[in-house]
């Protein structure tokens, strides 16, 4: 592990060490057109694209909303089988293909808009029928308002059970739709790709924060044109595909070192975003000021390289495990407080390894409101640059109530996604405990459905 100011993703570092059979981009998307074999973005070509992405180390999001609903006819005597039927093919591809021929931990996520006629089937399909893909529902406030109560109920249950993620529909500055990636922190055009890396806030002194942001963005922008991703013909070339994704990890470590709570930091960020600095906030104010200086410096670098989007807060578990803070403790993932101060990482690929975050504030001490204020205010700061992708925003299943009001509050917030539902009141961080929000009888029914199926892939942009 290292306490460097910049934490590279495994994909970038592995590509630098050995570019053979892999690419440094973390993610890509493919928008499937409603044709079996006609056109570059046909259904059949999507299979080749997904195969290419997984074999070269990129997680791939497949957007299926343009496909005709199940049972509809095309006027030529052909009847559509619907998006879910093709989802089973992508699941099998992900199960079978080894990323770069080394680790079997690729990621594939299927996306469908909430107003697609087959959305209920998409939400309620049993996990054993789609065991190697995750499912994400794309929506806007207007779409949610037009959604029936029955569909809302099914969607909320899917969120509680961990089977369904949410992503806001987003358009670029020219009004063209861009599409959520595997882990929901990046928005791309079809066949676009994104490089990711992270500022290790835990390795920074306060005055080093701007330098870390500047250096991290400079390295990403320099690497952007040298990846060779467009040479295969599958991905868009860097000359036209203009985005990178600089995120951050180790925030809890940084706050611990300067004895600042999440509540204090959130308040300082809020005041700064309103151009109202509170001089009584001490180190919380200083961290917030340096944080904004870093974001502004990184944004200027991205603009000088003509990037369309440049900030993305990814789920950095794997990357954080390889990074340490100034005092030698493991850097905490992304910007959220960890669930416990120590964690055993149980990975089917890498086995069980223990990690110690030090005496950081943990989620149960921070509280949902204080954490959400920090997350919202950071998103507002990044939004103000005009270069934001998004944030893989986890909810806390044993704290929040998954109901209409929760979704409506999320839609009105600066958050762009609703990712995993995590239990935070225990001491074990385990994203596989997807039934955390269910009652006992529901858990029994749920487990009966999945007990004998293959495990879900770890959908992590760094692994």
Model regions and ranges:
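Long, C-terminal-biased catalytic regions of enzyme "large/alpha" subunits
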Residues: 1-463
């Amino acid at each position: 592990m290292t306490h460097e100011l910049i934490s590279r993703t495994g994909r970038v570092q592995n590509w630098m060490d050995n570019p053979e059979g892999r690419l440094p981009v973390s993610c890509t998307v493919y928008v499937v057109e409603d044709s079996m074999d006609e056109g570059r973005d046909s259904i059949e070509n999507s299979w080749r694209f997904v195969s290419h992405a997984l074999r070269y180390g990129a997680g791939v999001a497949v957007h299926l909303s343009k496909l005709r609903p199940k049972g509809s006819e095309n006027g030529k005597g052909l009847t559509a089988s619907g998006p879910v039927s093709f989802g089973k093919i992508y699941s099998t591809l992900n199960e079978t293909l080894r990323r770069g021929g080394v680790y079997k931990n690729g990621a594939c996520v299927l996306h469908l808009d909430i107003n697609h006629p087959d959305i209920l089937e998409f939400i309620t399909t049993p996990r054993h029928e789609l065991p190697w893909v995750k499912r994400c529902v794309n929506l806007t406030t207007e779409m949610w308002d037009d959604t029936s109560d029955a569909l809302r109920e099914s969607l909320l249950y899917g969120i509680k059970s961990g089977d369904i993620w949410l992503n806001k529909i987003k358009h670029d500055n020219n009004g063209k739709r861009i599409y959520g990636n595997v882990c929901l922190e990046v928005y791309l055009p079809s066949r676009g790709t994104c490089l990711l890396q992270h500022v290790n806030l835990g390795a920074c002194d306060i005055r080093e924060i701007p330098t870390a942001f500047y250096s991290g963005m400079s390295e990403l922008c320099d690497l952007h044109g040298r990846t060779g991703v467009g040479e295969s013909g599958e991905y868009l070339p860097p000359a036209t595909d203009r985005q990178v994704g600089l995120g951050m990890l180790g925030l809890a470590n940084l706050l611990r070192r300067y004895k600042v709570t999440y509540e204090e930091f959130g308040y300082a960020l809020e005041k700064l975003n309103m151009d109202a600095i509170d001089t009584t906030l001490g180190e919380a104010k200083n961290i917030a000021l340096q944080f904004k200086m870093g974001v502004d410096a990184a944004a200027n670098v991205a603009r000088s390289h003509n990037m369309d989007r440049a900030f993305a807060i990814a789920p950095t578990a794997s990357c954080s495990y390889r990074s340490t803070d100034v005092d030698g403790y493991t850097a905490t993932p992304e910007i959220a407080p960890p669930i416990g101060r120590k964690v055993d990482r149980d990975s089917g690929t890498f086995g069980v390894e223990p990690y110690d975050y030090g005496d950081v504030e943990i989620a149960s001490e921070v509280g949902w409101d204080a954490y959400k204020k920090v997350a919202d205010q950071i998103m507002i700061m990044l939004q103000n640059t005009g270069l934001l992708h998004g944030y893989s925003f986890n909810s806390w299943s044993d704290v929040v109530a998954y109901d209409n009001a929760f979704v409506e509050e999320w839609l009105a917030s600066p958050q762009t996604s609703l990712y995993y539902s995590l239990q935070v009141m225990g001491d074990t961080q385990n994203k596989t405990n997807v039934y955390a929000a269910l009652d006992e009888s529901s858990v029994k029914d749920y487990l009966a459905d999945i007990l004998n199926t293959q495990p879900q892939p770890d959908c992590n942009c760094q692994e």
